[in-house]
A protein has these predicted regions:
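A structure-centric signal for secondary-structure junctions around beta-strands
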Residues: 11-13, 61, 139-140
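Alpha-helix N-cap/helix-start motif
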Residues: 27, 57-58, 91-94, 125, ...
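Extracytoplasmic/secreted envelope proteins and their assembly/folding machinery
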Residues: 31-38, 61-65, 78, 95, ...
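Structural microenvironment flanking redox-active thiols in thiol-disulfide oxidoreductases
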Residues: 40-71, 75-103
Length: 172
């Protein structure tokens, strides 16, 4: 249980937050499991992702994540970033590398520049920085259930998440 639980919406939903990093091999391996799990979750589960922001490369990757969300291309580009980093061994560690990546996947430089360094994306990255500290994220992937419970990625992580989701649902 978290020392300082996060406030969650009181809309009858149980929030599940996955904290990840594109460059993490464990996060990449867990991605297909998370996708499959998310397809089977009840309607009262609200699933979200948040990039970890420990250092400058993590913050750049967080800006990529929020840019991808802003242009509405999560379904295609999220997997493409993971693939580029893990299959092509291109860590995308500079803004120039990120720009080249987006160009290769068909995002125009004008669309990219509209979002990557925008106020909205910067604000979301800053919020991720705050939450990374507040939640004391020391490894990824990590899953937070309803702002209260921290689940480290292990083989049984999603079963643990299911248990906690049901427990939280019965408490609401």
């Amino acid at each position: 249980m978290l020392e300082n639980p996060l406030p969650t919406k009181q809309d009858g939903k149980v929030e599940v937050l996955e904290i990840f990093w594109y460059g993490c091999g464990h996060c990449y391996a867990m991605e297909s499991k998370i996708k499959a799990w998310n397809k089977t979750t009840p309607e009262y589960v609200s699933f979200k992702k948040m990039p970890v922001t420990w250092g400058s490369v993590h913050r750049l990757h967080a800006a990529m994540f929020y840019t991808i969300e802003s242009i509405g291309a999560e379904r295609d580009l999220h997997a493409a970033v993971f693939s580029t980093m893990h299959n092509e061994r291109n860590i995308l560690s500079s803004e120039q590398a990120v720009t080249r990546f987006f160009g290769k996947v068909g995002v125009s430089s004008s669309d990219l520049s509209k979002y990557l360094n925008s106020f909205g994306v910067k604000q979301r990255v800053n919020r991720a920085v705050e939450l990374t500290k507040q939640l004391r994220v020391d490894s990824v992937p990590m899953i937070i259930v309803d702002g209260k419970y921290k689940v480290a990625a292990r083989d049984t992580a999603l079963q643990t998440v299911d248990y906690l989701v049901e427990m939280q649902k019965s408490e609401s």
